[in-house]
């Protein structure tokens, strides 16, 4: 991994392209992306025009917005996270991980505070870093499991997808425990980080991504075993019970390579993307409605002003019925402001 200094990022910020458009205080969409060899944060408005870009030192992954700031985290394992000005894309602060740890790719904000997942370099035990609006560390507390990935917040606390993978930061894509992986959904208290609940997933099923709404919490997973033996990849937490949700008719874990890439709520429906199967699902857990839609390399999903947006590694982004073709290769996730 690369060592990143504040000076390096200040130089990078001078290379950023900043452009404002009349009538828009903040961009509509923020996403990590790639253009040639460059890794960027891309800020778009509703019709796909670029408002600004920010040059990153490596591949970015998760983002969050709060008031006038945006936070971006590098893809795991990462030794950097950044606070950017949401309107202009200018760099405000660099956040290093705690000593002996790396960031695991996701961040969530609540009022003036933000929470980043991180893990120990040895053993991958999970922690949550609590920071203020300028990147100052408020606290660090256990995540309740190994390898925390996506975090979401509601009035019950911080929900954490502890993926269960033990890795080495020098060999990040080698899972050291592929046959003994233990993943869980945990909930910690926002104020003091006290662990409230831990709900286990089936062995070797890695919980990766979460979405929360008044209809409950949805979780998307990746299976580490033989695809033909995969348990359900999509789960629904209703109250205190975690329930599996089957895929649409004609879809199997084999057809999506046992991997769901992102998840979101759209009204009463759960949207789950399967980039390796070139498809996304619309599922209503209350009525058992389930339907598959095809889209090449679709992964990012968000809801903006009540409308569903998706993005792909092929450079497509927008509402499914009005996708815009761009010059960027979008990463797995984006946020709709």
Please state what every model-predicted region is.
Residues 1-17:
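N-terminal secretory signal peptides and thylakoid transit peptides that target proteins
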């Amino acid at each position: 991994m690369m060592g990143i200094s504040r000076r390096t990022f200040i130089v990078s910020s001078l290379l950023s392209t900043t452009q404002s458009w009349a009538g828009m205080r903040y961009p509509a969409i923020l996403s990590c992306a790639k253009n040639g060899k460059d890794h960027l944060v891309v800020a778009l408005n509703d019709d796909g025009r670029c408002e600004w870009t920010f040059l990153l030192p490596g591949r970015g992954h998760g983002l969050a917005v709060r008031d006038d700031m945006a936070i971006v985290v590098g893809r795991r394992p990462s030794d950097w996270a950044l606070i950017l000005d949401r309107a202009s894309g200018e760099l405000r602060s660099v956040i290093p991980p705690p000593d002996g740890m790396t960031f695991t790719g996701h961040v969530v904000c609540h009022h003036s505070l933000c929470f980043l997942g991180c893990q120990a370099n040895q053993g991958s035990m999970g922690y949550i870093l609590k920071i203020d609006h300028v990147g100052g560390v408020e606290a660090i507390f256990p995540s309740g499991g190994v390898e925390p990935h996506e975090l979401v917040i509601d009035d019950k606390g911080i929900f954490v997808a502890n993926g269960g993978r033990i890795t080495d930061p020098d060999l990040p894509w080698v899972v050291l425990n592929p046959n003994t992986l233990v993943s869980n959904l945990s909930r910690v208290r926002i104020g003091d980080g006290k662990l409230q609940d831990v709900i286990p997933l089936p062995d070797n099923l890695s919980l990766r991504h979460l979405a929360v709404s008044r209809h409950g919490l949805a979780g998307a997973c990746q299976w580490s075993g033989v695809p033909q033996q995969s348990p359900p990849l999509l789960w629904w937490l209703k109250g205190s019970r975690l329930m599996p949700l089957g895929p649409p008719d004609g879809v199997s874990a084999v057809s999506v390579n046992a991997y769901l890439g992102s998840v979101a709520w759209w009204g009463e429906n759960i949207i789950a993307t399967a980039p390796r199967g070139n498809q996304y699902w619309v599922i209503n857990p209350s009525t058992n409605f389930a339907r598959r839609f095809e889209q090449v390399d679709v992964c990012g999903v968000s809801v903006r002003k009540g409308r569903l947006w998706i993005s792909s590694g092929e450079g497509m982004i927008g509402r499914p019925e009005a996708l815009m073709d761009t010059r960027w290769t979008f990463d797995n996730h984006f946020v709709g402001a």
